[in-house]
Regions:
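N-terminal active-site wall of soluble small-molecule enzyme domains
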Residues: 61-154, 169-172, 198-201, 265
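N-terminal small/glycine-rich loop or linker at the start of catalytic domains
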Residues: 42-63, 96-103, 108, 147, ...
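Structural preference for beta-strand elements that scaffold enzyme active sites
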Residues: 49-53, 83-85, 110-112, 132-135, ...
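Catalytic cores of alpha/beta
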Residues: 118-130, 165-176, 216-235, 240, ...
Length: 276
């Protein structure tokens, strides 16, 4: 682990300690209840799954969406998403745990807390703020840390998206019996994108594992092609960059040609479910 990723994780450790002082676990742990929204079930089945992301900024792109309104975004995503991802990292992504309950209130889908999770405290905090799943990155966790964090998440009925970015991490994910494996096409060490990573790594995972392709997915053509390798996709920047969010969602998820004349979300939903 080095460069951008190492810096983010080092800063995250500082953030966690400060947040523990500001909002101790003991002050809210008794109010935490296990989730009823099943992340694993939401991504299961034969239909391509889409985790659509609420993301204001990123280290690679800077500010992505100036008029960032989580409720408005969720009100569109809820017609198309299998689950919704919410960036919670403050320093590098201008995210917030406060966005989680806003999105959860608008959309019925499971909500994924997208953060650099290194401490059980973050998982308890995520659930307190109504997240139904969390991201665990094998690039920043050793196996023992992963087991501990995964156990905390599952104790709260939360799902885990286990992220890998190379073959070594993939082998670890298999050994750790990860249920949902996200293959990150972005190299967090230098921020480069390579969609071949999904093609190369997905084939190694068995049929009992849900494979999600993450990062760098911008077009319906890419979704169509990579759907032969992955069960689903996590898409954020490609949508957040567009002023007309609904049109962007329909374009990337459904293909522009296939939704001509479909102006209402429910029409697009029907078209998608019928295989359009």
């Amino acid at each position: 682990m080095q460069t951008v990723l190492a810096k983010i994780v080092a800063d995250k450790a500082i953030w966690v300690e400060a947040r523990k002082q500001q909002q101790p676990l003991a002050s809210f742990q008794n109010e935490i209840v296990p989730t009823q929204r099943n992340f694993y079930d939401a991504l299961a089945g034969t239909r391509t799954a889409f985790i659509l992301e609420c993301k204001k900024a990123s280290p690679s792109k800077g500010l992505i969406r100036e008029d960032f309104d989580p409720a408005a975004i969720a009100s569109i995503y809820k017609h198309y998403a299998s689950a919704i991802s919410v960036l919670c990292d403050e320093k590098y992504f201008q995210g917030s745990f406060d966005f989680l309950p806003i999105v959860s209130q608008v959309a019925p889908q499971p909500i994924l807390c997208k953060d650099f999770t290194i401490d059980p405290y973050q998982i308890y905090l995520a659930r307190y703020y109504q997240a139904d799943a969390c991201l665990l990155m094998l690039s920043v966790l050793d196996d023992e840390q992963y087991r501990q964090l995964s156990a905390v998440a599952h104790s709260l009925n939360m799902g885990v998206l286990t992220e890998v970015s190379n073959e070594e991490e993939l082998e670890r994910a298999i050994a750790l019996k990860a249920k949902v494996v996200g293959i990150n096409n972005r190299d967090l060490r230098d921020m480069s994108i390579d969609l071949n990573r999904t093609r190369q790594l997905a084939a190694r995972l068995g049929p009992d594992v849900t494979v999600i392709s993450e990062s760098g997915i911008h077009t319906y053509a890419e979704v169509s092609e990579l759907s032969h390798f992955a069960n689903g996709f996590l898409i954020g920047s490609a949508l957040m960059e567009q002023a007309d969010l609904e049109t962007a969602v329909k374009s990337v998820l459904l293909g522009e040609n296939k939704v001509c004349g479909l102006t209402r979300p429910q029409d697009a939903q029907v078209a998608w479910e019928s295989g359009a």
